[in-house]
């Protein structure tokens, strides 16, 4: 083959390969910084029953991860009182992301009901795609351990929260979606980030916030079956503070409502 033609084809290959493989999923972070600390009141909802359930927190710190600067985001959910006696939730979720908000490591230690599980997902970025090593231990027994390769940007539970805080919703209308990939257990699934419009939300710090309403829906590979995963109310400003976060459990949902926030970026 003519050398000039070969070089031209290589150029096209580099330019037009999927963004997930070559662009490596880099995002400019404009919404949070080292030292952000948000505390929440938790509410358990099952059917028509809603009860105060405990406390939660979302903390962000800048740390050293394998010799490089990284964001460490830690979410704690701890139920107590009557709701806690009905269905216990004591979860610790930790995510490490590089300075471009690419997930590096995610761990979840969860006591939910009478069960204990531990999940670990580690991400590596190579020329031929993204490798995700994932494993889960459930009640002391290993359920799976495998490595998945993908060419699209893929997020865990906490890095997806960092993602939606930095998306631009300016030109979106209610019903609009952004499609991403999400790691769920041993599978990479399709996820839609749904824009549901604007709303005023009163938080437990006594303030009323203008918020952007977001929900995230997980689809199967054929986009036929779906389930709601997370929904959030984010402040309609540069900080995109999660004022309310709804997380779906095996039974019911846990709602986190902002109680206090400090260390804001903007």
Residue ranges, per PLM feature:
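Bacterial N-terminal signal peptides that target proteins for export
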Residues: 1-8
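Bacterial N-terminal signal peptides
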Residues: 8-16
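Alpha-helical structural elements
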Residues: 11, 27, 35, 150-152, ...
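Sec/Tat signal peptide C-region and signal peptidase I cleavage site
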Residues: 19-23
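Acidic, serine/threonine-rich low-complexity disordered tracts
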Residues: 24-125, 169-266
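Active-site/ligand-binding surface loops and adjacent short beta/alpha elements
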Residues: 126-185
């Amino acid at each position: 083959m003519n050398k000039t033609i070969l070089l031209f084809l290589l150029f096209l290959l580099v330019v037009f390969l999927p963004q997930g493989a070559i662009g490596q999923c880099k995002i400019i972070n404009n919404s949070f910084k080292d030292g952000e600390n948000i505390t929440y009141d938790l509410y358990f909802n099952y059917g028509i029953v809603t009860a105060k359930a405990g406390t939660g927190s979302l903390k962000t710190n800048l740390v050293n991860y394998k010799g490089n600067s990284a964001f460490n985001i830690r979410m704690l959910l701890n139920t107590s009182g009557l709701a806690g006696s009905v269905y216990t939730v004591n979860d610790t979720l930790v995510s490490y992301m590089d300075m471009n908000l690419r997930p590096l490591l995610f761990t979840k230690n969860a006591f939910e009901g009478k069960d204990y599980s531990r999940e670990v997902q580690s991400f590596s970025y190579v020329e031929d795609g993204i490798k995700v090593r994932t494993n889960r231990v459930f009640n002391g027994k290993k359920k799976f351990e495998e490595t998945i390769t993908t060419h699209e940007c893929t997020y865990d539970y906490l890095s997806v929260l960092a993602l939606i805080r930095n998306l631009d919703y300016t030109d979106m209308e209610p019903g609009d979606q952004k499609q991403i990939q999400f790691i769920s257990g041993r599978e990479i699934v399709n996820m839609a980030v749904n824009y549901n419009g604007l709303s005023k939300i009163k938080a437990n710090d006594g303030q009323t916030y203008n918020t952007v309403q977001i929900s995230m829906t997980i689809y199967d590979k054929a986009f036929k079956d779906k389930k709601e995963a997370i929904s959030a109310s984010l402040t309609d400003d540069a900080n995109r503070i999660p004022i309310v976060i709804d997380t779906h459990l095996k039974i019911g949902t846990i709602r986190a409502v902002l109680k206090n926030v400090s260390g804001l970026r903007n």
